[in-house]
Amino acid sequence: MQPNRVYFGEVVDPDTGKMLDRALLIPFRAPRSYTGEDIAELHCHGSPYLLRRVLDLVCRLGARLAQPGEFTMRAFLNGKIDLAQAEAVADLIRARSEAQLRSALALHTGALSQKAQSLSDALLSLLAT
């Protein structure tokens, strides 16, 4: 499979041969992923029963469920995002208003980090003179 391409296919239980769903699979290769690691996304329909069946199947086949915040932690540890951006992910998830959403997006896109870096550069320049 080529990374960063979308594949459409059937999710089939190998034990029964029965199709569970039609789904999209997107493989990502390090470092070109959110976490900076090899990863795959599986997109299937949203029925809670169906999702439970698909998750049970992929776990039986060797996958495991991620812990809350695990992908963001891995992205931070692998240098894909900085601490302000990592905290902004939690803010995005918790946003309950337009103002909260805009604030979290500004942090997530690196606006605060860029301003902090500019201030740091200016201070270092002053200290060097």
PLM-predicted stretches and their roles:
Residues T129:
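Conserved G1/Walker A P-loop phosphate-binding module
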Residues S103-L126:
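An accessory alpha-helical subdomain
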